Curated annotation (Swiss-Prot):
Keywords, alphabetical: Capsid protein, Host nucleus, Host-virus interaction, Late protein, Viral attachment to host adhesion receptor, Viral attachment to host cell, Virion, Virus entry into host cell
Segments traversing the membrane: none
A Pfam family: Adeno_knob
GO cellular component, as recorded: host cell nucleus; viral capsid
Domain text: The tail region anchors the fiber to penton base capsomers, whereas the shaft, built from several repeated motifs, allows the knob to protrude from the virion.
UniProt subcellular location: Virion; Host nucleus
Protein name: Fiber protein
SUPFAM superfamilies: Fibre shaft of virus attachment proteins (SSF51225), Virus attachment protein globular domain (SSF49835)
Length: 367
């Protein structure tokens, strides 16, 4: 007759024997099971210890996969999805390269040919240009910054005779903006004050020809005593001469105090003048080296006559009505540069309008 063994009501036949199910047991794995990769969870159940990206999916050990990874059916291989220019080569991810890109020193770089360069700290101290691709420019070329970004430009020197026309073409002569000619226009309105305002009109054209200035001048008096010369009733010396002074500052700009109104004097634009007053015309001024201001007492080594041009014009264009013309350079003390026209006659004219013939002259330019 068998005898039934009496056991306690909370006896647990699952290892470890004799412990209640709800008891907190610090270590439950049998001695023949390693704790590496395994765990007792829930208590009393041997399970795998998982860490990302390993997971259990539908009772199977699985791998968590984000975007860009694919598990191939059949082979079970894990592959990487690529989009050009990325590619898989020999089980490695790479970049499909085409000119002008290359890999140098394990880094993606740009192959810069002639005329291009990548600025580094060693080649430029300007922080705004470091690590940027720039165009290398030589003589005659430069770069500009515009609202649309940088651009390459042709460098045109001031006073060099080159400019851009309205179409953007580089031209040696631009009649719309002729910086080689300063003038009053070919037929100006009355622009001078000999005795009273706007009583005469001076036609003056100065054209730069290298180191020389070619000039043309004529004077017509439209009102006042010189519009009808009568030396019988006006025989005084002052009634037989007219002076036209052009005074210029250090930039070659016509100053107040000149006989001519500065609003009539500018660079050429077709048969008129530029709309904006000019700011610099030193290249048209008489050379201070060739025509220095006169010193007192006079220096015998400096010519006292070189700064003058003396000749004749003819009133009304008639050879029997001569008038002496004297052009002096840089004689006026209250200006940096000056050109003065003296008209003087020695005959006694009666009822003759002062209307001089044109006179051409030249002088050495300041620069």
């Amino acid at each position: 007759m068998s005898k039934r063994l009496r056991v306690e009501d909370d006896f647990n036949p699952v290892y470890p024997y004799g412990y209640a199910r709800n008891q907190n047991i610090p270590f439950l794995t049998p001695p023949f099971v390693s704790s590496d990769g395994f765990q007792n969870f829930p208590p009393g159940v041997l399970s795998l210890k998982l860490a990302d990206p390993i997971a259990i999916a539908n009772g199977n050990v699985s791998l968590k996969m984000g975007g860009g990874l694919t598990l191939q059916e059949g082979t079970g291989n894990l592959t990487v999805n690529t989009e050009p220019p990325l590619q898989l080569t020999n089980n490695r991810i790479g970049i499909a390269l085409d000119a002008p890109f290359d890999v140098i020193g394990g880094k993606l770089t740009l192959l810069a040919g002639h005329g291009l360069s990548i600025i580094t700290e060693e080649t430029s101290p300007l922080p705004g240009l470091v690590n940027t691709l720039v165009v290398l420019t030589g003589k005659g070329l430069g770069t500009d910054t515009t609202d649309n970004g940088g651009s390459i430009r042709v460098r045109v020197g001031e006073g060099g005779g080159l400019s851009f026309n309205e179409a953007g073409d580089l031209v040696a002569f631009n009649k719309k903006e002729d910086m080689r000619t300063l003038w009053t226009t070919p037929d100006p309105s009355p622009n001078c004050k000999i005795i009273e305002d706007k009583d005469s009109k001076l036609t003056l054209i100065l054209t730069k020809c290298g180191s020389q200035i070619l000039g043309s001048v004529s004077l017509l008096v439209v009102k006042g005593k010189f519009s009808n010369i009568n030396n019988t009733t006006n025989p005084n010396e002052a009634d037989k001469q007219i002076t036209v002074k052009l005074l210029f500052d250090a930039n070659g700009v016509l100053k107040q105090g000149s006989t001519m109104d500065s609003s009539y004097w500018n660079y050429r634009s077709d048969n008129s003048n530029l709309s904006q007053p000019y700011k610099k015309a030193v290249g048209f001024m008489p050379s201070k080296t060739a025509y220095p201001k006169q010193t007192k007492p006079t220096n015998k080594e400096i010519s006292q006559a070189k700064n003058k041009i003396v000749s004749n014009v003819y009133l009304g264009g008639k050879i029997d009505q001569p008038c002496v013309i004297i052009i002096s350079f840089n004689e006026e003390a209250d200006s940096d540069y000056s050109i003065v026209f003296y008209f003087k006659w020695y005959k006694t004219y009666e009822n003759v309008q002062f209307d001089s013939s044109s006179f051409n002259f030249s002088y050495i330019a300041q620069e």
